[in-house]
Amino acid sequence: MSSQIIDRPKHELSRAELEELEEFEFKHGPMSLINDAMVTRTPVIISLRNNHKIIARVKAFDRHCNMVLENVKELWTEKKGKNVINRERFISKLFLRGDSVIVVLKTPVE
């Protein structure tokens, strides 16, 4: 990747240069965590704005953190009076809109 593409404003880049820049950013920038998880098919932990947590494999994603996930386990808690109930459900495939994502973590190695 030439520094000429990285340093130039995006509106000056051609479509091919924009695609090359996006690919570079996915492999070397903050999105590399999601890209690596997608390529190696390792699960990630995703914390959502509604305080739910998701453990899933990333099938696809974009620059807005929209993700297609598979083998999804969603975890959350519910309060019933003084009792706290841990809830979970399984979803085989899920499209997750990126604006609900707070943080994406690698799953710990067991």
UniProtKB/Swiss-Prot annotation:
SUPFAM superfamilies tied to this protein: Sm-like ribonucleoproteins (SSF50182)
InterPro entries: LSM_dom_sf, Sm, Sm_D2, Sm_dom_euk/arc
Entries under PROSITE patterns matching the protein: SM
Any one biological process term the GO annotation gives: spliceosomal snRNP assembly
A Pfam family: LSM
Keyword Ribonucleoprotein among record annotations: yes
Occurrences of domain Sm (ranges): 31-110
Subcellular localization, as worded in the UniProt entry: Nucleus; Cytoplasm, Cytosol
Subunit structure: Component of the Sm core complex, present in spliceosomal snRNP U1, U2, U4/U6 and U5. The core complex contains SMB1, SMD1, SMD2, SMD3, SME1, SMX3 and SMX2 (Sm proteins B, D1, D2, D3, E, F and G, respectively), and is probably a heptameric ring structure.
Protein name: Small nuclear ribonucleoprotein Sm D2
